[in-house]
Amino acid sequence: MPHFLAKLDSKPLEYPLIRGDFCFHREFLSLKHPTKSCVHASFKNDVFLLQKIRRAGDFLIKSEKATPLKREILKQALRIYSQSFEVISHNLQENSKHASQKKALDLETFEDFIQKNQAPILIEIGFGSGRHLIELAKNNPTTTCLGIEIHTPSIAQALKQIELLDLKNLHILQGDGRLVLESMPNHRCEKIFVHFPVPWNEKKHRRVLSEKFLNEALRVLKPRGFLELRTDDSLCFEDSLKLALKNFQCEIEIKKNAQIPVVSKYEARWNKLKKDIYDLKIYSLGLDENPTQNHALDFSFDTITIDKESVGAILKTPKIIKEGYFVHVCNIYENKGDFLVELSMGDFDWPVRLFVLLAENQVFYLNKSPLKTLNNHKAHLLLQNILSQKELDERDHRSE
């Protein structure tokens, strides 16, 4: 991670510090850990935070992961900020020109990606080695393709192939495919592929394909678009088939041991062992003219008045756990009566770290809002109650 170390006796800074397109607005001091602070900064329209940690013999100054920037811009920001200190050491050298420039999307940048790509897209969830995904993109050069994966080595391997093959229509997102679909607008997918997911026969609630997932898939698929499940696990196939048969929004197509043009490494292994492979293709009929979607969920805050006394009570709030979501106030930072609240919150499947700024009678998420899912919205409403102290007044701190 880009950072630098500075001497403790470095001169105090005067804010705001403006250098070109960079502005370091002010420094918020932690009310929980006196050795920590956050520097509120911006580059053009991008807002970010720097962490400043006082140690035994130096300051450590680095990026705050909850407010990400492109790596080279972040390094430039730290290089500029370091000019106001007596630097002991750093790792802020410019990257090699030969370094890979292709990066994975994340859940925080996904909404921007969807807004820029209005045409229906092809999605593969859990692409593993990436063989099927790469061929999908090669065979559909004018269609935007998206691979969703949580396994970092698989993502790195796919990104390398994308760069080598110059596949400009293929993008990779690191995240939970269930949450990605839930946050998407209606009728934005042409096809969704789920090939050889972990069957989770002993923990079925962890499966990708559930009743909720199927409903979301049918919502985001355009009419006659399809979700394709390919699996070697008969129980997983049978349970998925039962889910599809109960849903009146779709029609299904079943195949067994079908030959397909692209065979994954996993499938090739089972073919050698003569193991059965099942295909379940679920077509969206598009019967629901106004399907419910989460894309319009409101993550703004009502007006909140806060002072040091109420901040102390909020900071002492224990983690509040509800069914499927939670809110944890991790820390609060202060600067002349304005407050920066550090949070861990949201859906249990993919919790996020966020910062909320309370300044000049305004309350808003700094840098990014939570992904627009139902559980994240419930967590947002709970946070609204915590900050306005409604949840504190009700004494609802018990874990459910």
Swiss-Prot record:
Keywords: Methyltransferase, S-adenosyl-L-methionine, Transferase, tRNA processing. Its EC number is 2.1.1.33. It is an enzyme of class 2 (transferase). It comes from the Bacteria. It comes from Helicobacter pylori (strain J99 / ATCC 700824). Substrate binds at residue 232. PANTHER family: 3-DEOXY-D-MANNO-OCTULOSONIC-ACID TRANSFERASE/TRNA GUANINE-N 7 - -METHYLTRANSFERASE, PENTACOTRIPEPTIDE-REPEAT REGION OF PRORP DOMAIN-CONTAINING PROTEIN. GO terms for cellular component: tRNA methyltransferase complex. S-adenosyl-L-methionine binds at residues 124, 149, 176. The gene is trmB. Catalyzes the formation of N(7)-methylguanine at position 46 (m7G46) in tRNA. This is tRNA (guanine-N(7)-)-methyltransferase.
